[in-house]
């Protein structure tokens, strides 16, 4: 609609344009329509060479023939009695009974019509079925001769009135039915008073059955006659056309005869109705009649059920006949006994009128929608007489009614961390059904086909709190005793069944067998068990918290008692034993006093480390996640956490746990929550290095130590590197003392000599041999992906706490730099595709634009002018990305073979950097040894 301000002329113009467009379109259509011959070929037009006048006559003839056929059918239409018999005309049940049973003989119009053949064939097959289902009766005569009371019992009293007189009348005079009805009424009161002693419903089938033989024979006679007469109706041929008026004259006699029959039937029908009404008024039976018979008749007409239905609505409650084939015929209570009968199993199939009648009989409110009526009846059924044979299918929502039964289903990524984790890469089918058995042990059944992969590195590490029995292959094994897990699952008392779900996400329901089990138990016992579980869990939680506090105090004491000279660490085994502790800081952050720890952020649990966390077999990746808690700094430092994990979530801080990636890579996640501002980053506990003394990693399972520090991301790329880093001695003075392993490695000394000779570091740097584990020749970083050629991270990244000595730390710290400078994880363990790319782009632009780092001697990637400040406070204390060292020197300097045999961490890794970012000779590493 154009704006109102536009003038009327504009609208006019628009309308005319639209009209013109429509006109053009129609003209085009007319022009492009196919030829007549084409239309004839496609049977759209008829091929006729006749003149138009002939065609017009042909049409007239067709119409006349149609009209003729219709007139014939109207003339021979069935009378009202036949309509009642065929369940087309709704009438009161008593009338219908009399007519259907055949006690009233009436002239059948349909005998001479072809119409009846079709209609009776269509309608009659239902009757035999219904009769047979109602039980067999010896002979039709038996019912006719049967005692009036017997025939009356199953029907309502009014039926007796109409049936018995008709039975006597029909043999004498059809049209004098007024007189005889008067004697029988006295029979009715006894039948009413003795309502309780009424026999079974067998009499109902008796009445119905009696008409079956007759109707079958009539049908056969009728169909024979109709077949004989059919040619008469269709005998008019095209050239013998006779106009309708002449035809009527000629066909008047038969039409009159059929019309006379219809009139006869009409009279008889009216008389029956009048009789019926008189009887009703005379005996005042309206009060005990069932729901209006008309609705029953309509229901029958619409649903096509056999006439049995209308009878069975009025059956007594004691009647035990089987329901009719459609499931609609039911034995209800009647006016005779007044007791409500058993409801059928399928209430949904009942009509609203029937439901209301049932409710009336049970003196329940009748108003409301069909569903409400059904609910009311169901409730009544459950209270009074639950039918054991017909259990109702419970609604899906009402399965878990019982207090003790709970099945918790959540995506695998969200276990125990609540909203703290971003469930990034999970398919909806990867639902973990976590169930707590009565022993308090949490069991997990994953419904995904592969073990769910954690979208963020912290996800699993928060869960595992050192269950020594769990094997590394069992991805959820470490969680079994996690207090966090149990707390999240046990907000309410639980008595839970372990059930492996199918791939339907979130539809967790208890198996019926289990439900029966639970119901059988004593409820008091269950409650006691639950109380015990809760107490045990709270006790465990308190113990963990005390442990956290103790370790926190220990760390603070050690931090105060630190001396500048750290202990040297041996490099004897092919697995690097990294005992050095990272004391480096973001160069931007001034050395402040050590901040007291948030108890929930301390990382004590590293001494629970699972001895089998380093699994032999597929290559593992140690992903350490550090939650650094930035304090307010002069430069704006928005805290960008990897997931929305608050510090309070990391209470039971976890040992490195094993997660199997979708590519088969094991990711060992350790959480070392760090305080970004305590210069020593001392929350990486000193016990950590010795926590895995006895597990040397086998050669194939080289692990990559990707530390993901959750670092503040600073406002501008260059602001990161503006400040000069603190001196080496200062940094060292704040470094916690590491456990000394005694044998200072000769290889490390050689490395320092080489570096000093090449002019890469100053001579006074020879002092700290304690940082061997941190040497990170970047060319070998991430399993041969082009990432690997990055220079080792320079001093401005805070190196996180070293991994346990059992895990051979890769000499690649590029990721630390990437994360510390951007605050984002470089490689997430799962399916994160494009995210790392943007991170690397940011980093690339930062490194290219920052001028503070360009005063360093050229590194192997001189082409991209990436130089790093040789900061003495860096964890390595030496910048190993030396231009004079060839890539092969790095291979020799590294701590042996296993480091190179890494499998790719993620499928997106090779695409992280463009290859022009690297210098030529850096790319000549042994990529194939990595793959």
Curated annotation (Swiss-Prot):
Query: Which domain of life, per UniProt?
Result: Eukaryota
Biased composition range(s): Polar residues? 151-162, 191-215, 459-473, 732-746
The entry's keywords: Actin-binding, Chromosomal rearrangement, Coiled coil, Cytoplasm, Disease variant, Nucleus, Phosphoprotein, Proto-oncogene, Repeat, Transcription, Transcription regulation
Q: Where is this region: Disordered?
A: 110-256, 290-344, 444-476, 558-577, 674-746, 763-816
The record's tissue-specificity note reads: Ubiquitously expressed, has been detected in lung, placenta, small intestine, liver, kidney, spleen, thymus, colon, muscle, heart and brain. Expressed in peripheral blood mononuclear cells (at protein level).
Q: Which residues carry this modification: Phosphothreonine?
A: 305, 313, 447, 450, 456
PTM sites of type Phosphoserine: 6, 124, 139, 156, 310, 312, 317, 320, 333, 385, 446, 449, 454, 458, 482, 492, 507, 511, 685, 691, 695, 792, 807, 859
Tell me what PTMs the record reports for this protein: Phosphorylation at Ser-6 by Erk inhibits binding of globular actin (G-actin), unmasking the nuclear localization signal (NLS) and promoting nuclear import.
Q: Is the keyword Coiled coil in the record? A: yes
Q: Where in the cell is it found?
A: Cytoplasm; Nucleus
Positions of the UniProt region annotated as Intervening spacer sequence 1? 6-23
Pfam families with a match to the protein in the record: RPEL, SAP
Give the compositionally biased regions (Pro residues): 180-189
Coiled-coil region(s): 515-563
Mark out the compositionally biased spans (Low complexity): 310-320, 678-694, 784-799
Site (Breakpoint for translocation to form RBM15-MRTFA): which residue positions? 3-4
- State one molecular function term (GO): actin binding
User: What note about domains is in the entry?
Assistant: The N-terminal region is required for nuclear localization and the C-terminal region mediates transcriptional activity. The RPEL repeats mediate binding to globular actin (G-actin); each RPEL repeat-binding to one G-actin monomer. In addition, each intervening spacer sequence region can bind one G-actin monomer, to reach a pentavalent complex.
What is known about what this protein does?
Transcription coactivator that associates with the serum response factor (SRF) transcription factor to control expression of genes regulating the cytoskeleton during development, morphogenesis and cell migration. The SRF-MRTFA complex activity responds to Rho GTPase-induced changes in cellular globular actin (G-actin) concentration, thereby coupling cytoskeletal gene expression to cytoskeletal dynamics. MRTFA binds G-actin via its RPEL repeats, regulating activity of the MRTFA-SRF complex. Activity is also regulated by filamentous actin (F-actin) in the nucleus.
Assembly and binders: Interacts with SRF, forming the SRF-MRTFA nuclear complex which binds the 5'-CArG-3' consensus motif (CArG box) on DNA via SRF. Interacts (via RPEL repeats) with globular actin (G-actin), thereby regulating its subcellular location and activity of the complex formed with SRF. Either forms a trivalent (by binding three G-actin monomers) or pentavalent (by binding five G-actin monomers) complex with G-actin. Forms a nuclear ternary complex with SCAI and SRF, leading to suppress MRTFA-induced SRF transcriptional activity.
**Identification of the protein by name:** Myocardin-related transcription factor A
Which organism does this sequence originate in?
A: Homo sapiens
